[in-house]
Design a protein with these regions (language model features):
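Nucleic-acid substrate recognition interfaces
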Residues: 1-169
Length: 169
Protein backbone atom coordinates (compact mmCIF):
# COMPACT_ATOMS: atom_id res chain seq x y z
CA UNK A 1 0.00 0.00 0.00
CA UNK A 2 2.88 2.40 0.66
CA UNK A 3 4.07 1.78 -2.89
CA UNK A 4 0.63 2.95 -4.09
CA UNK A 5 1.06 6.21 -2.19
CA UNK A 6 4.54 6.84 -3.59
CA UNK A 7 3.47 5.90 -7.12
CA UNK A 8 0.31 8.01 -7.04
CA UNK A 9 2.10 11.09 -5.74
CA UNK A 10 4.82 10.68 -8.38
CA UNK A 11 2.18 10.20 -11.09
CA UNK A 12 0.25 13.34 -10.09
CA UNK A 13 3.44 15.43 -9.92
CA UNK A 14 4.74 14.19 -13.29
CA UNK A 15 1.34 14.36 -15.01
CA UNK A 16 0.74 17.98 -14.03
CA UNK A 17 4.36 18.96 -14.67
CA UNK A 18 3.98 17.66 -18.24
CA UNK A 19 0.72 19.61 -18.62
CA UNK A 20 2.30 22.81 -17.30
CA UNK A 21 5.33 22.40 -19.53
CA UNK A 22 3.19 21.81 -22.63
CA UNK A 23 0.89 24.72 -21.75
CA UNK A 24 3.81 27.08 -21.23
CA UNK A 25 5.46 26.09 -24.53
CA UNK A 26 2.22 26.80 -26.41
CA UNK A 27 0.87 29.92 -24.68
CA UNK A 28 3.73 31.23 -22.51
CA UNK A 29 1.35 30.82 -19.56
CA UNK A 30 0.65 27.87 -17.32
CA UNK A 31 -2.10 26.97 -14.90
CA UNK A 32 -1.68 27.50 -11.18
CA UNK A 33 -2.23 25.25 -8.17
CA UNK A 34 -5.95 26.00 -7.83
CA UNK A 35 -6.74 25.23 -11.47
CA UNK A 36 -4.76 22.00 -11.28
CA UNK A 37 -6.42 20.98 -8.00
CA UNK A 38 -9.83 21.34 -9.68
CA UNK A 39 -8.55 19.30 -12.62
CA UNK A 40 -7.25 16.62 -10.24
CA UNK A 41 -10.67 16.35 -8.60
CA UNK A 42 -12.35 15.97 -12.00
CA UNK A 43 -9.68 13.48 -13.09
CA UNK A 44 -10.36 11.25 -10.06
CA UNK A 45 -14.03 11.02 -11.08
CA UNK A 46 -13.19 9.48 -14.46
CA UNK A 47 -12.97 5.73 -14.99
CA UNK A 48 -9.36 5.86 -16.19
CA UNK A 49 -8.06 7.53 -13.01
CA UNK A 50 -10.47 6.15 -10.41
CA UNK A 51 -7.53 4.38 -8.72
CA UNK A 52 -6.44 7.80 -7.40
CA UNK A 53 -9.45 7.70 -5.04
CA UNK A 54 -7.60 5.09 -2.97
CA UNK A 55 -5.07 7.74 -1.92
CA UNK A 56 -5.72 10.52 0.60
CA UNK A 57 -6.78 13.58 -1.41
CA UNK A 58 -4.69 15.97 0.70
CA UNK A 59 -1.60 13.91 -0.04
CA UNK A 60 -2.21 14.29 -3.78
CA UNK A 61 -2.93 18.00 -3.36
CA UNK A 62 0.34 18.37 -1.50
CA UNK A 63 2.15 17.02 -4.58
CA UNK A 64 0.51 19.83 -6.57
CA UNK A 65 1.63 22.37 -3.95
CA UNK A 66 5.15 20.99 -4.25
CA UNK A 67 4.98 21.45 -8.03
CA UNK A 68 3.63 25.00 -7.61
CA UNK A 69 6.53 25.88 -5.30
CA UNK A 70 9.03 24.44 -7.78
CA UNK A 71 7.52 26.52 -10.60
CA UNK A 72 7.47 29.74 -8.56
CA UNK A 73 11.07 29.23 -7.47
CA UNK A 74 12.13 28.64 -11.07
CA UNK A 75 10.49 31.80 -12.38
CA UNK A 76 11.96 33.84 -9.52
CA UNK A 77 15.42 32.60 -10.52
CA UNK A 78 16.04 30.64 -7.32
CA UNK A 79 16.46 27.23 -8.91
CA UNK A 80 16.39 25.35 -12.20
CA UNK A 81 13.31 24.14 -14.04
CA UNK A 82 11.36 21.38 -12.21
CA UNK A 83 12.28 17.86 -13.25
CA UNK A 84 10.18 14.74 -13.50
CA UNK A 85 10.36 12.39 -10.51
CA UNK A 86 11.55 8.84 -11.08
CA UNK A 87 11.24 5.60 -9.11
CA UNK A 88 14.96 5.01 -8.86
CA UNK A 89 15.68 8.11 -6.76
CA UNK A 90 13.30 7.22 -3.95
CA UNK A 91 10.50 9.59 -3.14
CA UNK A 92 8.29 11.04 -0.47
CA UNK A 93 4.72 11.96 0.29
CA UNK A 94 3.18 14.23 2.89
CA UNK A 95 0.10 13.73 5.01
CA UNK A 96 -0.91 17.20 6.16
CA UNK A 97 -3.85 16.18 8.39
CA UNK A 98 -5.89 13.40 9.94
CA UNK A 99 -3.09 11.02 10.87
CA UNK A 100 -2.55 9.52 14.30
CA UNK A 101 0.42 8.19 16.22
CA UNK A 102 -0.45 5.55 18.79
CA UNK A 103 2.49 3.88 20.47
CA UNK A 104 4.77 2.66 17.70
CA UNK A 105 2.07 2.75 14.98
CA UNK A 106 1.08 5.48 12.54
CA UNK A 107 -2.43 5.59 11.12
CA UNK A 108 -2.77 7.30 7.73
CA UNK A 109 -6.15 8.14 6.11
CA UNK A 110 -7.34 5.53 3.57
CA UNK A 111 -4.52 3.20 4.63
CA UNK A 112 -5.72 -0.16 5.87
CA UNK A 113 -4.34 -0.68 9.36
CA UNK A 114 -1.46 1.11 11.01
CA UNK A 115 2.18 1.14 10.01
CA UNK A 116 4.69 0.03 12.62
CA UNK A 117 7.74 2.22 13.04
CA UNK A 118 10.75 2.49 15.31
CA UNK A 119 10.19 5.58 17.41
CA UNK A 120 13.40 7.47 18.17
CA UNK A 121 11.65 9.84 20.56
CA UNK A 122 8.18 10.61 21.86
CA UNK A 123 6.03 12.90 19.76
CA UNK A 124 4.95 15.75 22.02
CA UNK A 125 2.50 18.50 21.17
CA UNK A 126 -0.15 18.90 18.50
CA UNK A 127 0.52 16.85 15.34
CA UNK A 128 0.81 19.10 12.29
CA UNK A 129 2.29 17.26 9.31
CA UNK A 130 3.93 13.99 8.45
CA UNK A 131 6.28 13.12 5.60
CA UNK A 132 7.10 9.54 4.65
CA UNK A 133 10.17 9.06 2.46
CA UNK A 134 11.95 6.11 0.93
CA UNK A 135 15.60 5.88 -0.09
CA UNK A 136 16.70 4.26 -3.36
CA UNK A 137 17.87 1.32 -1.21
CA UNK A 138 14.33 0.76 0.10
CA UNK A 139 14.63 2.19 3.62
CA UNK A 140 11.58 4.08 4.85
CA UNK A 141 11.68 7.13 7.08
CA UNK A 142 8.92 9.16 8.66
CA UNK A 143 9.25 12.76 9.81
CA UNK A 144 6.51 14.05 12.09
CA UNK A 145 6.10 17.75 12.70
CA UNK A 146 4.37 18.71 15.93
CA UNK A 147 3.76 22.09 17.49
CA UNK A 148 4.66 22.11 21.13
CA UNK A 149 2.79 24.26 23.56
CA UNK A 150 4.90 27.01 25.13
CA UNK A 151 5.51 26.85 28.86
CA UNK A 152 3.93 29.78 30.59
CA UNK A 153 4.85 31.22 33.94
CA UNK A 154 3.19 33.93 35.95
CA UNK A 155 5.16 36.99 36.93
CA UNK A 156 3.67 39.11 39.68
CA UNK A 157 4.22 42.82 39.88
CA UNK A 158 3.19 44.78 42.95
CA UNK A 159 2.51 48.46 43.12
CA UNK A 160 1.20 50.39 46.11
CA UNK A 161 -2.38 50.22 44.77
CA UNK A 162 -2.69 46.88 42.93
CA UNK A 163 -1.17 43.52 42.08
CA UNK A 164 -0.82 42.49 38.43
CA UNK A 165 -0.04 39.05 37.02
CA UNK A 166 1.49 38.69 33.53
CA UNK A 167 2.22 35.57 31.52
CA UNK A 168 5.67 35.09 30.02
CA UNK A 169 6.92 32.41 27.69
Amino acid sequence: MLANYFGSVRFVYNHFLAKRKEQYEQTRKSSNYYEQAKELTAMKKTEAFSWLKEINSQTLQHALRHLETAYVNFFKGRTRFPRFHSKKHGGSFAVPQHFKVEGNRIFIPKFKGGIRFAKSQDVLGELRNMTVSVTPGGKYYVCIMAQSMPTLRLVFSKSPTSTCAMMQT
